[in-house]
Amino acid sequence: MSTNFEKHFEENVDDCNLEQLRDILVNKEGKSALANRFRALFNLKTAASEFEANPSDAEKAVQYMGETFGDNSELLKHEVAYVLGQTKNLKAAPLLRKTMLDLAQQPMVRHEAAEALGALGDKDSLEDLEKCLKNDPHVAVRETCELAIARINWQHSDAPTKESLQQSLYSSIDPAPPLALEKEYDLEELKKLLNDQEKPLFLRYRAMFRLRDIGTDEAVLALASGFNDPSALFKHEIAYVFGQMGSTAAVPSLTEVLGRKEEAPMVRHEAAEALGAIASEDALPILKQYLNDEVDVVRESAIVALDMWEYENSNELEYAPA
């Protein structure tokens, strides 16, 4: 989910204490709309991230978010895993390891738990990540473990201090850093590296995030070429990146991917959310087409994306100069 989504949801919750936020998140009364559950989640994330200033509340927030892993919503659980990884709070690592290893959870949730462990840079999770890399029955989980292991090893090497990295416009902790600035690449070179299936996935992701940070329409088109890749994980990350970039140049390719009935749900759901984040006029009727999609995670993503679309466009009207 894009940082625009997060900003929206953080701004739209009335003042609640942690227990009230938990009750909304887990839908204790059975009446909480999905969008409000996301709002509660991102407010709990804020508390969990403040583990140095308020460790007690941070630990509670992690625990309360973890209660959601018993929910039926694949979309919500996957978002909880993502959020836990973004908190930088290592107290979340045991919960994420348990979720990653739980074969009763949906693969999309387990993949997100593995990615979150990479985002945390948790060395204590390397053993379990290696185990999943070798033995997990789902390709997307194995590929995510490969990335998470590479990211943790990169983070704990001297590379972060030696490499010159572009200051990111985005607040997210990504599955891989962008390619270092020491070497100059033109767009064609980055596109070629992005699509080279012989190269390590971590390196291809680094090319992806370098293209994201370039941010031009030409970079969008180069990224869109990755939608032809066989890896659902890879394609879902491109859709996520498009949601961050907010470029209308991505709308045609996202629309095409969302419409692929044979495509993996994790890819289609991310395409829907990206269209909501971009919030262009032509995205609205597209998203409405999927409000009754037969795939739960796609249908729920369309609901959340429309909530975001309406927010972005109402703000645009409200703040438009006279």
From Swiss-Prot:
HEAT-like PBS-type repeats lie at residues 109-135, 203-229, 234-260, 267-293. Binds 2 Fe(2+) ions per subunit. It is found in: Cytoplasm; Nucleus. Its EC number is 1.14.99.29. Disulfide bonds: none annotated. One of its GO terms (molecular function) is metal ion binding. Fe cation 1 binds at H78, E79, H111, E112. It comes from the Eukaryota. Belongs to the deoxyhypusine hydroxylase family. This is Deoxyhypusine hydroxylase. It comes from Candida glabrata (strain ATCC 2001 / BCRC 20586 / JCM 3761 / NBRC 0622 / NRRL Y-65 / CBS 138) (Yeast). The gene is LIA1.
